[in-house]
Amino acid sequence: TRRSSDLGYAPCLNLYDTQKAIGLLKRLFEDTLGGALHLRRVSAPLFVEASTGLNDDLNGVERAVSFDIPDAGRDAQVVHSLAKWKRMALYRYQFSVGEGLYTDMNAIRRDEELDNLHSVYVDQWDWEKIIAPRDRNADYLRQTVRTIVSAMAETQHTLRSVFPQLTALPPLGTEVSF
């Protein structure tokens, strides 16, 4: 197996502080963006029944990690995408227009090409929101992007105050060009 140092990555924090920083980052970003976009947390599945079709194959070539559940007489797949599942969850949780969900997906993508940003194991934060037909336009999309960038910058600012070692990285700006 390759280590991060083999891939040209040099961490700013030790291993334990990296875990603490990741946990804090997740909590801060969830709270900040969740409040700004009216999102609520929903737990994501670790696996889905293969027959449901909810495990989106992203670009058509991913092979799911599959296993049988003998007592249930069913086959399951470890998730590698929540695209379809999120839309079903919006319906099942009875979200309304202007509301949405965020979730933290833990997945296995067996066919992933590995590098500094990609791993076979995926811990991915994701969100989905119901918008009105009148909001399906470029202005609404641009405002949503500005909100996301602002939440990212606010999260980074707080994270850097807790972990000063991260100040070696450039701060995120809040200006967005389209």
Where are these regions (language model features)?
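Conserved alpha/beta core surface patches that mediate binding of polyanionic ligands
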Residues: 83-123
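A generic structural motif
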Residues: 13-17, 126-137
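N-terminal "assembly arms/tails" that initiate or stabilize quaternary assembly
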Residues: 11-90
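Broad gene-expression machinery/nucleic-acid interaction feature
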Residues: 62-64, 73-75, 101-103, 122-126
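Long, well-ordered alpha-helical scaffolding segments within enzyme catalytic domains
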Residues: 138-157
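Short, small-residue-biased leader/transition segments that mark boundaries at the very start
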Residues: 1-4
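Alpha-helical scaffold segments that mediate packing/assembly in large oligomeric complexes
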Residues: 153-178
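Short, flexible loop/turn elements at secondary-structure junctions
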Residues: 48-50, 82, 106-109, 131-133
